[in-house]
Amino acid sequence: MKLDIRPTFLDSALRQSAPVQKGVRKMVETAAHLSLGELLNHEGVHLEKAKGLLTRDGKPQYTLRVTRSARAIATVEGDTLVLLFVEPDHDKAY
């Protein structure tokens, strides 16, 4: 899948602890090699639609597992996964 890594994602990823940064690298590498369908079924990435979270233009947002507690927030535009932000607290990601 194509990736669009937004500055907000990069900034938030760089502010995280070393284990979360390592998880971000692993998640990005995995996502880059899978289709959307494969990501939706991948147990490690655990891509799921975030209920009630929409972008400003009304597109659904998704979460991806970075570590046991950290999640990446993303949206999908065509065949591109747009990475928006890294949230270190699982509960705050939703």
Each language-model region and where it sits:
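Basic, Lys/Arg-enriched alpha-helical interface segments
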Residues: 1-70, 76-94
